[in-house]
Amino acid sequence: MSKRDYYEVLSVSRDASEREIKKAYKRLAMKFHPDRNPGDKQAEANFKEVKEAYEILTDADKKAAYDQFGHAGVDPNRGGGGFGGNADFGDVFGDVFGDIFGGGRRGGGQRQAARGSDLRYNLELSLEEAVKGLTKELRIPTLAACDSCDGSGAKKGTSPTTCGTCHGQGQVQMRQGFFAVQQACPTCHGRGKIIKDPCNKCHGEGRVEKSKTLSVKIPAGVDNGDRIRLSGEGEAGEFGAPPGDLYVQVSVREHTIFVRDGNNLYCEVPISFSKAALGGEIEVPTLDGKVNLKIPAETQTGRMFRMRGKGVKSVRSHAVGDLLCKVVMETPVKLNERQKELLREFDETLTGSSSKKHSPKAEGFFDGVKKFFQDLNS
Protein backbone atom coordinates (compact mmCIF):
# COMPACT_ATOMS: atom_id res chain seq x y z
CA MET A 1 0.00 0.00 0.00
CA SER A 2 1.48 3.34 -1.07
CA LYS A 3 2.10 6.02 1.53
CA ARG A 4 0.19 9.28 1.51
CA ASP A 5 2.05 12.49 0.79
CA TYR A 6 3.38 13.91 4.07
CA TYR A 7 2.08 17.40 3.30
CA GLU A 8 -1.34 15.89 2.62
CA VAL A 9 -1.19 13.99 5.92
CA LEU A 10 -0.69 17.25 7.84
CA SER A 11 -3.04 19.23 5.55
CA VAL A 12 -0.42 21.89 4.80
CA SER A 13 0.95 23.31 1.55
CA ARG A 14 4.40 22.36 0.26
CA ASP A 15 5.74 25.83 1.07
CA ALA A 16 4.36 25.81 4.63
CA SER A 17 6.65 27.28 7.30
CA GLU A 18 7.98 25.19 10.18
CA ARG A 19 5.60 27.03 12.49
CA GLU A 20 2.60 26.07 10.32
CA ILE A 21 3.78 22.45 10.22
CA LYS A 22 4.11 22.33 14.01
CA LYS A 23 0.69 23.89 14.48
CA ALA A 24 -0.92 21.34 12.14
CA TYR A 25 0.87 18.47 13.88
CA LYS A 26 -0.25 19.58 17.33
CA ARG A 27 -3.88 19.80 16.20
CA LEU A 28 -3.89 16.38 14.50
CA ALA A 29 -1.85 14.65 17.20
CA MET A 30 -4.38 15.74 19.82
CA LYS A 31 -7.22 14.58 17.56
CA PHE A 32 -5.83 11.07 16.95
CA HIS A 33 -3.92 10.49 20.22
CA PRO A 34 -4.52 6.92 21.52
CA ASP A 35 -5.38 8.24 24.98
CA ARG A 36 -8.30 10.14 23.45
CA ASN A 37 -9.32 7.20 21.25
CA PRO A 38 -8.88 4.04 23.34
CA GLY A 39 -9.25 0.86 21.27
CA ASP A 40 -9.60 2.77 17.97
CA LYS A 41 -7.08 1.11 15.61
CA GLN A 42 -7.69 3.61 12.81
CA ALA A 43 -7.01 6.57 15.11
CA GLU A 44 -3.81 4.85 16.25
CA ALA A 45 -2.71 4.37 12.63
CA ASN A 46 -3.53 8.00 11.85
CA PHE A 47 -1.54 9.15 14.88
CA LYS A 48 1.53 7.19 13.72
CA GLU A 49 1.16 8.59 10.20
CA VAL A 50 0.93 12.16 11.51
CA LYS A 51 3.95 11.65 13.78
CA GLU A 52 6.02 10.21 10.92
CA ALA A 53 5.12 13.11 8.63
CA TYR A 54 6.01 15.64 11.35
CA GLU A 55 9.40 14.04 12.05
CA ILE A 56 10.35 14.16 8.38
CA LEU A 57 9.09 17.68 7.62
CA THR A 58 10.71 19.29 10.68
CA ASP A 59 14.14 17.77 10.00
CA ALA A 60 15.89 20.02 7.46
CA ASP A 61 17.93 17.23 5.83
CA LYS A 62 15.08 14.73 5.69
CA LYS A 63 12.66 17.36 4.40
CA ALA A 64 15.08 18.30 1.60
CA ALA A 65 15.47 14.64 0.65
CA TYR A 66 11.70 14.10 0.73
CA ASP A 67 11.01 17.23 -1.33
CA GLN A 68 13.53 16.05 -3.92
CA PHE A 69 12.95 12.28 -4.07
CA GLY A 70 9.63 11.68 -2.33
CA HIS A 71 9.25 8.73 0.06
CA ALA A 72 12.23 7.01 -1.58
CA GLY A 73 14.50 9.77 -0.28
CA VAL A 74 13.66 9.04 3.37
CA ASP A 75 13.10 5.27 3.21
CA PRO A 76 15.83 3.63 5.37
CA ASN A 77 15.34 0.35 3.50
CA ARG A 78 15.91 1.90 0.08
CA GLY A 79 19.18 0.90 -1.58
CA GLY A 80 20.29 -1.61 1.07
CA GLY A 81 19.12 -4.83 -0.60
CA GLY A 82 19.67 -6.55 -3.91
CA PHE A 83 17.66 -5.94 -7.07
CA GLY A 84 14.99 -8.32 -8.26
CA GLY A 85 15.03 -9.77 -11.74
CA ASN A 86 12.49 -7.20 -12.99
CA ALA A 87 13.96 -4.18 -11.18
CA ASP A 88 13.89 -0.89 -13.12
CA PHE A 89 17.41 0.46 -12.64
CA GLY A 90 16.31 3.74 -14.20
CA ASP A 91 14.03 4.38 -11.21
CA VAL A 92 16.87 3.85 -8.75
CA PHE A 93 19.61 5.80 -10.51
CA GLY A 94 17.22 8.31 -12.02
CA ASP A 95 16.28 9.51 -8.53
CA VAL A 96 19.92 10.20 -7.73
CA PHE A 97 21.24 11.52 -11.01
CA GLY A 98 18.07 13.15 -12.27
CA ASP A 99 18.37 16.26 -10.15
CA ILE A 100 21.84 16.97 -11.46
CA PHE A 101 20.45 17.24 -14.97
CA GLY A 102 17.37 19.24 -14.19
CA GLY A 103 14.99 17.21 -12.04
CA GLY A 104 13.95 13.60 -11.52
CA ARG A 105 11.45 11.75 -13.65
CA ARG A 106 8.82 11.91 -10.90
CA GLY A 107 7.32 8.57 -11.87
CA GLY A 108 7.49 9.12 -15.63
CA GLY A 109 5.67 12.46 -15.68
CA GLN A 110 6.78 15.46 -17.65
CA ARG A 111 9.63 17.54 -16.29
CA GLN A 112 8.53 20.50 -14.20
CA ALA A 113 9.94 23.92 -15.08
CA ALA A 114 12.50 25.16 -12.55
CA ARG A 115 11.57 27.68 -9.88
CA GLY A 116 13.29 31.04 -10.19
CA SER A 117 16.58 31.63 -8.39
CA ASP A 118 16.69 33.49 -5.08
CA LEU A 119 18.38 36.89 -5.08
CA ARG A 120 20.47 38.62 -2.41
CA TYR A 121 20.71 42.38 -1.97
CA ASN A 122 23.29 43.85 0.44
CA LEU A 123 21.81 46.89 2.18
CA GLU A 124 24.04 49.18 4.26
CA LEU A 125 22.30 51.34 6.87
CA SER A 126 23.40 54.04 9.29
CA LEU A 127 22.91 53.26 12.98
CA GLU A 128 20.08 55.79 13.13
CA GLU A 129 18.29 54.11 10.20
CA ALA A 130 18.71 50.66 11.73
CA VAL A 131 17.40 51.80 15.12
CA LYS A 132 14.47 53.88 13.88
CA GLY A 133 13.43 51.80 10.86
CA LEU A 134 12.47 53.22 7.47
CA THR A 135 11.25 52.40 3.98
CA LYS A 136 13.97 52.02 1.34
CA GLU A 137 13.62 52.13 -2.42
CA LEU A 138 15.78 49.33 -3.82
CA ARG A 139 16.66 48.89 -7.47
CA ILE A 140 17.05 45.17 -8.17
CA PRO A 141 18.57 43.72 -11.37
CA THR A 142 16.78 40.44 -12.11
CA LEU A 143 15.37 38.06 -14.70
CA ALA A 144 11.69 38.82 -15.30
CA ALA A 145 9.10 36.89 -17.28
CA CYS A 146 9.03 38.07 -20.89
CA ASP A 147 5.95 40.22 -21.39
CA SER A 148 5.86 39.47 -25.11
CA CYS A 149 5.34 35.71 -24.76
CA ASP A 150 4.10 35.66 -21.12
CA GLY A 151 7.14 33.59 -20.17
CA SER A 152 6.47 30.67 -22.53
CA GLY A 153 9.45 31.38 -24.80
CA ALA A 154 7.28 30.84 -27.89
CA LYS A 155 6.20 33.52 -30.33
CA LYS A 156 2.76 34.95 -29.63
CA GLY A 157 0.06 32.70 -31.09
CA THR A 158 2.24 29.58 -30.84
CA SER A 159 3.03 27.16 -28.01
CA PRO A 160 5.97 24.94 -27.07
CA THR A 161 5.57 21.28 -28.07
CA THR A 162 6.55 18.17 -26.13
CA CYS A 163 10.01 16.88 -27.02
CA GLY A 164 9.74 13.70 -29.09
CA THR A 165 13.10 12.35 -27.89
CA CYS A 166 12.47 12.36 -24.13
CA HIS A 167 8.65 12.61 -24.29
CA GLY A 168 8.66 15.66 -22.05
CA GLN A 169 10.81 14.17 -19.27
CA GLY A 170 13.85 16.33 -20.04
CA GLN A 171 16.09 13.26 -19.64
CA VAL A 172 17.08 10.19 -21.57
CA GLN A 173 18.35 6.91 -20.18
CA MET A 174 21.83 5.76 -21.13
CA ARG A 175 22.89 2.19 -20.35
CA GLN A 176 26.51 1.51 -19.56
CA GLY A 177 26.88 -2.21 -19.06
CA PHE A 178 25.05 -3.22 -15.90
CA PHE A 179 24.11 0.34 -14.98
CA ALA A 180 21.60 2.77 -16.40
CA VAL A 181 21.90 6.50 -15.76
CA GLN A 182 19.87 9.53 -16.69
CA GLN A 183 21.29 12.47 -18.59
CA ALA A 184 19.89 15.68 -20.02
CA CYS A 185 18.05 15.19 -23.28
CA PRO A 186 20.33 16.38 -26.12
CA THR A 187 17.35 17.51 -28.21
CA CYS A 188 15.58 19.83 -25.74
CA HIS A 189 18.59 20.37 -23.42
CA GLY A 190 16.68 19.07 -20.41
CA ARG A 191 13.60 21.27 -20.83
CA GLY A 192 11.16 18.61 -22.01
CA LYS A 193 9.73 21.10 -24.52
CA ILE A 194 10.69 22.20 -28.01
CA ILE A 195 10.13 25.79 -29.11
CA LYS A 196 9.87 25.69 -32.88
CA ASP A 197 9.01 29.37 -33.26
CA PRO A 198 10.84 31.30 -30.49
CA CYS A 199 9.80 34.70 -29.17
CA ASN A 200 11.74 37.53 -30.82
CA LYS A 201 12.17 39.43 -27.56
CA CYS A 202 13.52 36.70 -25.24
CA HIS A 203 14.81 34.39 -28.01
CA GLY A 204 12.97 31.42 -26.58
CA GLU A 205 14.25 31.79 -23.00
CA GLY A 206 10.94 32.98 -21.53
CA ARG A 207 12.80 35.52 -19.39
CA VAL A 208 14.57 38.83 -19.99
CA GLU A 209 17.04 40.90 -17.97
CA LYS A 210 15.28 43.73 -16.22
CA SER A 211 15.63 46.06 -13.24
CA LYS A 212 12.75 46.66 -10.88
CA THR A 213 12.28 49.08 -8.00
CA LEU A 214 10.86 47.82 -4.73
CA SER A 215 9.76 49.73 -1.63
CA VAL A 216 11.11 47.67 1.25
CA LYS A 217 10.06 48.38 4.83
CA ILE A 218 13.00 47.98 7.19
CA PRO A 219 11.72 47.32 10.73
CA ALA A 220 13.11 49.32 13.65
CA GLY A 221 15.88 47.56 15.56
CA VAL A 222 17.55 45.56 12.77
CA ASP A 223 21.23 44.79 13.26
CA ASN A 224 24.26 43.50 11.38
CA GLY A 225 23.55 40.13 9.78
CA ASP A 226 19.75 40.39 9.90
CA ARG A 227 18.04 39.17 6.76
CA ILE A 228 14.67 40.25 5.37
CA ARG A 229 12.88 37.85 3.03
CA LEU A 230 10.61 39.16 0.27
CA SER A 231 8.68 36.18 -1.03
CA GLY A 232 8.31 35.95 -4.80
CA GLU A 233 10.58 38.93 -5.54
CA GLY A 234 13.49 36.87 -6.86
CA GLU A 235 14.10 35.83 -10.45
CA ALA A 236 11.13 34.71 -12.54
CA GLY A 237 10.71 30.96 -12.82
CA GLU A 238 11.48 29.02 -15.97
CA PHE A 239 8.57 29.04 -18.44
CA GLY A 240 5.94 30.19 -15.98
CA ALA A 241 7.27 28.37 -12.89
CA PRO A 242 7.05 30.22 -9.53
CA PRO A 243 9.59 32.99 -8.90
CA GLY A 244 12.34 32.83 -6.32
CA ASP A 245 12.64 35.02 -3.23
CA LEU A 246 14.65 38.17 -2.54
CA TYR A 247 16.78 38.29 0.61
CA VAL A 248 17.86 41.72 1.85
CA GLN A 249 21.06 41.33 3.91
CA VAL A 250 21.51 44.15 6.43
CA SER A 251 24.83 45.67 7.49
CA VAL A 252 25.18 48.71 9.75
CA ARG A 253 27.96 51.29 9.39
CA GLU A 254 30.17 52.16 12.36
CA HIS A 255 28.98 55.22 14.27
CA THR A 256 31.22 58.09 15.33
CA ILE A 257 29.79 58.17 18.87
CA PHE A 258 27.93 54.97 19.70
CA VAL A 259 28.88 51.31 19.70
CA ARG A 260 26.01 48.82 19.61
CA ASP A 261 25.99 45.50 21.44
CA GLY A 262 22.65 43.75 21.07
CA ASN A 263 20.03 46.24 22.20
CA ASN A 264 22.45 48.31 24.31
CA LEU A 265 24.43 51.33 23.15
CA TYR A 266 27.81 52.39 24.55
CA CYS A 267 29.62 55.71 24.36
CA GLU A 268 32.52 57.54 26.01
CA VAL A 269 31.89 60.99 27.48
CA PRO A 270 34.87 63.26 28.30
CA ILE A 271 34.65 65.27 31.55
CA SER A 272 36.99 67.80 33.11
CA PHE A 273 39.09 67.19 36.20
CA SER A 274 37.08 69.74 38.18
CA LYS A 275 33.74 68.22 37.10
CA ALA A 276 34.91 64.77 38.16
CA ALA A 277 36.10 66.07 41.53
CA LEU A 278 33.24 68.44 42.37
CA GLY A 279 30.36 66.77 40.52
CA GLY A 280 27.71 68.43 38.40
CA GLU A 281 25.68 67.86 35.27
CA ILE A 282 26.91 67.14 31.76
CA GLU A 283 25.11 66.83 28.42
CA VAL A 284 25.07 63.34 26.95
CA PRO A 285 24.05 62.51 23.35
CA THR A 286 21.32 59.92 22.75
CA LEU A 287 19.56 58.84 19.57
CA ASP A 288 16.60 60.97 20.68
CA GLY A 289 18.65 64.11 21.38
CA LYS A 290 20.72 65.48 24.26
CA VAL A 291 19.92 64.66 27.89
CA ASN A 292 21.51 65.75 31.17
CA LEU A 293 23.50 63.25 33.21
CA LYS A 294 24.27 63.94 36.87
CA ILE A 295 27.90 63.28 37.80
CA PRO A 296 28.47 62.68 41.52
CA ALA A 297 31.43 64.33 43.24
CA GLU A 298 34.67 62.32 43.34
CA THR A 299 33.80 60.36 40.17
CA GLN A 300 36.76 58.35 38.89
CA THR A 301 37.62 58.06 35.20
CA GLY A 302 36.19 54.94 33.56
CA ARG A 303 33.04 54.88 35.66
CA MET A 304 30.00 53.63 33.74
CA PHE A 305 26.59 55.27 33.99
CA ARG A 306 23.49 53.46 32.76
CA MET A 307 20.60 55.37 31.21
CA ARG A 308 17.70 52.94 31.08
CA GLY A 309 15.52 52.79 28.01
CA LYS A 310 17.86 54.95 25.92
CA GLY A 311 19.17 52.06 23.83
CA VAL A 312 17.60 50.15 20.93
CA LYS A 313 14.12 48.65 20.77
CA SER A 314 14.35 44.95 19.95
CA VAL A 315 13.16 43.99 16.48
CA ARG A 316 11.76 40.73 17.92
CA SER A 317 10.03 41.97 21.09
CA HIS A 318 8.97 45.11 22.96
CA ALA A 319 12.17 45.14 25.03
CA VAL A 320 14.31 48.30 24.89
CA GLY A 321 18.02 48.37 25.67
CA ASP A 322 20.01 50.91 27.69
CA LEU A 323 22.64 53.54 26.95
CA LEU A 324 25.85 53.01 28.94
CA CYS A 325 28.06 56.08 29.22
CA LYS A 326 31.68 55.69 30.27
CA VAL A 327 33.12 58.92 31.64
CA VAL A 328 36.73 59.64 30.72
CA MET A 329 38.53 62.39 32.63
CA GLU A 330 40.46 64.64 30.26
CA THR A 331 43.85 66.03 31.21
CA PRO A 332 43.93 69.78 30.45
CA VAL A 333 46.41 70.80 27.74
CA LYS A 334 48.05 74.05 26.54
CA LEU A 335 48.01 75.59 30.02
CA ASN A 336 49.32 79.12 30.58
CA GLU A 337 51.74 79.94 33.39
CA ARG A 338 49.02 81.10 35.78
CA GLN A 339 47.08 77.87 35.34
CA LYS A 340 50.21 75.79 35.88
CA GLU A 341 51.02 77.76 39.03
CA LEU A 342 47.53 77.19 40.42
CA LEU A 343 47.80 73.45 39.74
CA ARG A 344 51.17 73.28 41.53
CA GLU A 345 49.68 75.07 44.54
CA PHE A 346 46.71 72.73 44.48
CA ASP A 347 48.97 69.68 44.24
CA GLU A 348 50.94 70.84 47.30
CA THR A 349 47.72 70.86 49.31
CA LEU A 350 47.22 67.17 48.47
CA THR A 351 50.67 65.96 49.57
CA GLY A 352 51.79 65.04 53.01
CA SER A 353 49.87 63.22 55.72
CA SER A 354 46.49 63.86 54.08
CA SER A 355 47.44 62.40 50.68
CA LYS A 356 45.93 58.98 51.45
CA LYS A 357 42.61 60.63 52.13
CA HIS A 358 42.63 62.46 48.79
CA SER A 359 44.14 59.72 46.60
CA PRO A 360 43.42 56.34 48.22
CA LYS A 361 43.89 54.38 44.99
CA ALA A 362 47.29 55.93 44.25
CA GLU A 363 48.52 55.45 47.81
CA GLY A 364 47.35 51.84 47.76
CA PHE A 365 49.21 51.26 44.52
CA PHE A 366 52.49 52.70 45.78
CA ASP A 367 52.19 50.82 49.08
CA GLY A 368 51.82 47.64 47.02
CA VAL A 369 54.88 48.48 44.91
CA LYS A 370 56.91 49.16 48.05
CA LYS A 371 55.91 45.80 49.56
CA PHE A 372 56.70 44.02 46.29
CA PHE A 373 60.31 45.21 46.28
CA GLN A 374 60.71 44.48 50.00
CA ASP A 375 59.60 40.89 49.44
CA LEU A 376 61.85 40.65 46.39
CA ASN A 377 64.93 41.68 48.34
CA SER A 378 64.22 39.70 51.50
From Swiss-Prot:
InterPro entries: DnaJ, DnaJ_C, DnaJ_domain, DnaJ_domain_CS, HSP40/DnaJ_pept-bd, HSP_DnaJ_Cys-rich_dom, HSP_DnaJ_Cys-rich_dom_sf, J_dom_sf. Residues 5-70 form the J domain. The keyword Cytoplasm applies. PROSITE patterns: DNAJ_1, DNAJ_2, ZF_CR. One of its GO terms (biological process) is DNA replication. Zn(2+) 2 binds at residues 163, 166, 185, 188. Belongs to the DnaJ family. This is Chaperone protein DnaJ. It comes from Shewanella sediminis (strain HAW-EB3). The lineage of its organism: Bacteria, Pseudomonadati, Pseudomonadota, Gammaproteobacteria, Alteromonadales. The gene is dnaJ.
